[in-house]
A protein has these predicted regions:
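N-terminal transmembrane-helix/juxtamembrane module of multi-pass inner/ER membrane proteins
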Residues: 1-63, 109-114, 118-120
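Residue-level signature of transmembrane alpha-helical entry/exit and packing/kink sites
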Residues: 9-13, 17, 79-80, 159-162, ...
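Hydrophobic faces of alpha-helical transmembrane segments in multi-pass integral membrane proteins
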Residues: 15, 19, 23, 82, ...
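Aromatic-anchored segments of alpha-helical transmembrane domains
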Residues: 21-26, 88-96, 164-174
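Membrane-interface loops
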Residues: 27-42, 47, 70-154
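Alpha-helical transmembrane segments of integral membrane proteins
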Residues: 52-56, 60, 79-83, 132, ...
Length: 199
């Protein structure tokens, strides 16, 4: 195990998820004045519990893509690191400076697996610090960092599959009422900005 870690020292960058995650947790515990995020389009988007599946897949997509590229193509992995972690820090800084919340989550009452998953998410993911959406930022940032270098030209099916999942992840945030459309746009803006800065 020690030899494996010595050989793959770049895996250590993934420990930054714990650091930024700790800061995010702290931002949710502080008694900050959270401002409500809402737009008219949010009211027109229906609650669609089945979208909890791509929302949950985000938890596999982000570390999975980064781990895969760490072994498959270290150059792309480094670009992912330079795009994702500074962007996460920026988002967390925004959470401290401009704390936000949503107040339009439904009760998700009734039976069925999808509604149960939504209730579980609601119980464990507080509707605070929603702008910009970390779900959308990280999904878009990882996809851009992975395929912007031309990697997708030789791995077209992989690129298309990733793009479809990223779109579904972004849609899921509004269809299960975890985010406002404004949060999605904010996350996309941060992702594109960090991607451009990372080169």
């Amino acid at each position: 195990m020690v030899n494996f870690l010595k050989k793959h020292k770049d895996l250590g960058w993934l420990s930054l998820f714990l650091v930024v995650g700790g800061l995010y947790f702290l931002s949710q515990q502080l008694p900050l004045d959270h401002r409500s995020v809402h737009c008219a389009l949010d009211d027109k988007i229906p609650f669609w519990p089945a979208f909890c599946i791509p929302y949950v897949l985000w938890y596999l997509y982000i570390p999975g893509m980064m781990l895969y590229m760490c072994f498959r193509d270290p150059a792309i992995y480094h670009r992912q690191v330079l795009t994702v972690f500074p962007g996460m820090l920026l988002c967390t800084l925004i959470f401290f400076i401009y704390p936000t919340r949503i107040d339009f989550r439904p009760m998700s009452e009734g039976t069925g697996f999808f509604r149960w998953v939504c209730r579980f998410l609601y119980a464990n993911d507080r509707p605070m610090n929603v702008f910009p959406s970390l779900h959308c930022f990280e999904a878009i940032a990882v996809h851009l960092a992975t395929f912007a270098s031309g990697y997708g030209k030789t791995h077209r099916a992989f690129q298309i599959g990733s793009a479809v999942l990223v779109v579904l992840i972004c849609l899921s945030t509004v269809f299960i009422k975890q985010h406002s459309v404004l949060d999605v746009l904010g996350g996309a803006a941060v992702a594109c900005t960090m991607h451009a800065l990372a080169g």
